[in-house]
Amino acid sequence: MKKAGLLFLVMIVIAVVAAGIGYWKLTGEESDTLRKIVLEECLPNQQQNQNPSPCAEVKPNAGYVVLKDLNGPLQYLLMPTYRINGTESPLLTDPSTPNFFWLAWQGRDFMSKKYGQPVPDRAVSLAINSRTGRTQNHFHIHISCIRPDVREQLDNNLANISSRWLPLPGGLRGHEYLARRVTESELVQRSPFMMLAEEVPEAREHMGSYGLAMVRQSDNSFVLLATQRNLLTLNRASAEEIQDHQCEILR
């Protein structure tokens, strides 16, 4: 019993330290790097010179930019042209806010252009990390390759994923995930952030504790994946963990 109590105490200490490290990362100047690139470089250059650089694309009227990430050969980031910190923002459950996940899915074309040939949809994944699972304080969706082991696990669970948010059998990467199947027409009409907030009990009040990902399945449907922060299990809700920025799946 004493050993069990000690182990529990150690886990709590580790969780508190992890939370503290996450907070420290988000309070430094470097946490504003992406926001400065968008607002001080990409957007002004597009508006003044019709040149999106250093971004790959700037769409002021649509409210987003696409930027090549330095990590990995094919990873891109989709970001808003205005201030949104992350998943905790109430703007993401406002119907007037752009459907950033759908826009990010269109942004996968940049991966193919960079690769020099079409990147199969089955190799692509989108992910956004929770408030404690990110290092930047500007909303950004990672557009990158999926890990081969995650791809295989989702393929094997195709029949078990329904149109309701349900626990994914076995979770992913050692963490619990909710999974929901959506059609392309559903995705076009409704943001995954709204689906999560409106369909998962108490999610709306705790959106910042969730990481969210999206993957296409072999039947052309999409799977939404949501993981919630749980520091006792060392889960910071970094949905980016399902991605492989080195793109082994293409080799």
Swiss-Prot record:
Transmembrane segments: 4-24
Transcription found in the keyword field: no
Pathway assigned in UniProt: Phospholipid metabolism; CDP-diacylglycerol degradation; phosphatidate from CDP-diacylglycerol: step 1/1
Organism: Escherichia coli O7:K1 (strain IAI39 / ExPEC)
Lineage: Bacteria, Pseudomonadati, Pseudomonadota, Gammaproteobacteria, Enterobacterales
Enzyme Commission code: 3.6.1.26
Any one Pfam family match given in the protein's UniProt record, by short name: CDH
GO cellular component term, pick one: plasma membrane
SUPFAM superfamilies associated with the record: HIT-like (SSF54197)
UniProt protein name: CDP-diacylglycerol pyrophosphatase
InterPro entries in the cross-refs: CDP-diacylglyc_Pase (IPR003763), CDP-diacylglyc_Pase_proteobac (IPR015993), HIT-like_sf (IPR036265)
Protein topology in the membrane: Single-pass membrane protein
Gene3D superfamilies: HIT family - CDH-like
Single GO molecular function: CDP-diacylglycerol diphosphatase activity
Family: Belongs to the Cdh family.
Gene designation: cdh
GO biological process terms on file: CDP-diacylglycerol catabolic process; phospholipid biosynthetic process
Keywords, alphabetical: Cell inner membrane, Cell membrane, Hydrolase, Lipid biosynthesis, Lipid metabolism, Membrane, Phospholipid biosynthesis, Phospholipid metabolism, Transmembrane, Transmembrane helix
